[in-house]
UniProtKB/Swiss-Prot annotation:
Cellular component GO terms, alphabetical: mitochondrial inner membrane; mitochondrial small ribosomal subunit; mitochondrion; ribosome
Principal place of residence: mitochondrion
Localization per Swiss-Prot or TrEMBL: Mitochondrion
Pfam family for this entry, one: Ribosomal_S7
Protein name as it appears in the record: Small ribosomal subunit protein uS7m
Amino acid sequence: MAAPAVKVARGWSGLALGVRRAVLQLPGLTQVRWSRYSPEFKDPLIDKEYYRKPVEELTEEEKYVRELKKTQLIKAAPAGKTSSVFEDPVISKFTNMMMIGGNKVLARSLMIQTLEAVKRKQFEKYHAASAEEQATIERNPYTIFHQALKNCEPMIGLVPILKGGRFYQVPVPLPDRRRRFLAMKWMITECRDKKHQRTLMPEKLSHKLLEAFHNQGPVIKRKHDLHKMAEANRALAHYRWW
């Protein structure tokens, strides 16, 4: 086990001091597992308003931070990030999960068509309703999308824990990222079901989103089924701490 480490150390010691410093500063050669950048690199700030703000309006602290960034190491901005007003990290995550075979152009097009279909359906419902009912109809597709996913998020999940040679499904509270992931996964899985093969993806997804927005549909039922299973296994909840 020690031989490879000694070999690497000798290889590093054979390099000149200037070469070693240059290699250590290269992000692609930094010895950090699964990371392109070393811990010294800071996350990029993708905000046009921050850079458009004149220097005269900055506070002393903001001036110091801006001057400090001139000498700091900054990570490259991700290719999918943008400073557009339409940028939504949740929709971007949903688009990436919906993507198949790396065809992000198609996934993004389907997402745009889905939001357009949601808006068309809500406006049709709005114009067909009475004056009193129009005030209760939500027409913003972004608000409907976020609320639909929020309604699909489970609060408690099941985790297999080995105890006495057997695996038990133990109920545990889920973190926010896991809740959001399950809601998106269930929504996409239901839309890819083979029951309605002739229905296009934007039409199916918009229908599922509107159902989830009103706390209805198979995705909401799937969340309730998971909660019922967690309630049935609540006697095993103490296995979390063992």
